Design a protein with these regions (language model features):
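Short cysteine-rich clusters marking metal-coordination/redox-active sites
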Residues: 11-14, 37-40, 58, 70-73, ...
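Canonical RING-type zinc finger of E3 ubiquitin-protein ligases
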Residues: 16-28, 44-53, 76-87, 108-118, ...
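Cys/His-coordinated zinc-finger cores
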Residues: 29-43, 57-66, 88-98, 120-130, ...
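Short metal-binding segments enriched for Cys and/or His
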Residues: 34-50, 66-72, 97-103, 129-132, ...
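A metal-dependent hydrolase signature that marks the N-terminal structural subdomain at the beginning
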Residues: 104, 117, 124-257
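Pan-zinc metallopeptidase signature
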Residues: 131, 159-170, 180, 219, ...
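Active-site scaffold of zinc-dependent metalloenzymes
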Residues: 243-283, 290-297
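Post-HExxH zinc-binding segment in Zn-dependent metallohydrolases
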Residues: 298-342
Length: 375
């Protein structure tokens, strides 16, 4: 912009000839009093001004009208600003009044953050004070992790690093493994070891309480004395005589009397259970084997494998359900989901029959007809 004194220029503002000083700006000449702000219409004079769409503005008027306004204090924003949900904010207004605050330290969150249970956290605050810790290595669980049946949280990679307890499915890291265990023995976690049935007196106390429970469900044993044995895996395999696989945990002890190669009678002597089972599983195995014993005592022979094993699994399942503790619910779920065509599918078929008929009627029909009720 320049001020000049010449002859008869025409003012763009009023269209009249200019006598005296005038302004040359925006490619035109102006009376000084006619070169005005497009907003307030007051002369701009020789001060700094802004141009927008070919129109002049006082700098203050320009910023007041054209600059974004802070959605919090409603004042114009002339420098850097933050946007949030389509609104603009002064940095200080945003940080003090708008930005999310860490649920732990209550300071503004300006960068990346974690959300947990609808609350926001600084990454460091979440990592150091909020994130769950791996039950095995203690590291904060910041990404995908595993939660097992027991609610134990741990790093996903540990699934391929540590063996699982043979009885409850918990992972067993090296520091929790039994140092004296033979390589042929199953891995047990500290929880299962803590309740393991290792001695016959222990076992007998628990076993004695089972028969009254089964009697109350209509399974009579006629006061026949049933012995209980605790055996190792080698002895259990001998007693099974190849009748079951390596996963067997118990066996019914029977004596078969034959005449002229014909079975004349079968006697039940008791049951044998693998030593070292956790107490809840021990009881469930005992109930299963007592199911086999009851079938023999009632003279029920020749059932299909799925029917006999399914019936015995049903007894264990009902026992676990009545016990209704974490361990029993875990074992009951294992029975429900067992993919084995004999034990798993057998249980599901027998369970459906018993549900349809009612358990007491189902047992009585089985006892009197000596065969599995029709599906």
């Amino acid at each position: 912009m320049s001020m000049a004194r010449t002859s008869q220029p025409v003012c763009k503002g009023c269209g009249q000839s200019i006598n005296g000083y005038y302004l040359t700006v925006l490619g035109a000449t102006w009376h000084p009093e006619h070169f005005v702000c497009a907003i307030c219409h007051q002369p701009i004079g020789d001060t700094q001004f802004n141009i927008h769409d070919g129109k002049p503005y006082h700098t203050e008027c320009y910023h007041d009208r054209m600059d974004p306004r802070c959605a919090y204090c409603h004042k114009s924003i002339t420098g850097q600003y933050y946007t949030h949900n389509g609104a603009a904010y002064h940095p200080e207004c945003y940080q003090e009044h708008i930005v999310s605050r860490c649920e732990y330290c209550h300071k503004p969150i300006m960068g990346q953050y974690y959300t947990h249970e609808s609350a926001s956290y600084h990454t460091a605050c979440y990592r150091d004070h909020v994130a769950p810790r791996c039950a095995y290595c203690g590291k904060p669980l910041m990404s995908e992790y595993v939660v097992d049946h027991w609610g134990t949280k741990y790093c996903k990679e540990h699934q391929s690093q540590y063996p699982k307890c043979a009885y409850c499915g918990r992972l067993v890291p090296p520091q929790q493994q039994e140092q004296a265990a033979m390589s042929s023995e199953r891995v047990r976690c500290p929880f299962c070891r803590a309740s393991a049935i290792e001695s016959l007196p222990q076992a007998r106390i628990l076993f004695q309480g089972l028969l009254p429970q089964l009697n109350a469900q209509g399974l009579q044993y006629n006061n026949i004395p049933l012995q209980l044995e605790l055996v190792d895996r080698v002895r259990l395999a001998q007693l099974l005589h190849g009748r079951s696989g390596a996963d067997a945990l118990g066996v019914t002890l029977q004596s078969t009397h034959m005449l002229n190669k014909q079975i004349v009678r079968t006697e039940v002597n008791g049951i044998a259970v693998l030593r070292g089972l956790p107490s809840t599983l021990f009881l469930g195995v005992c109930v299963h084997e007592l199911g086999h014993a009851w079938l023999t005592l009632q003279g029920i022979q020749g059932l299909a494998s799925w029917a006999e094993e399914g019936f015995c699994e049903l007894l264990s399942y009902r026992f676990y359900g009545k016990l209704n503790i974490d361990e029993s619910r875990h074992h009951a779920e294992g029975i429900e989901k067992n993919p084995d065509p004999v034990y798993g599918e057998g249980f599901r078929r027998v369970h459906a029959m018993a549900d349809r008929m009612g358990f007491q009627r189902f047992v009585e029909t089985l006892r009197t007809t000596k065969r599995m009720p029709s599906a």
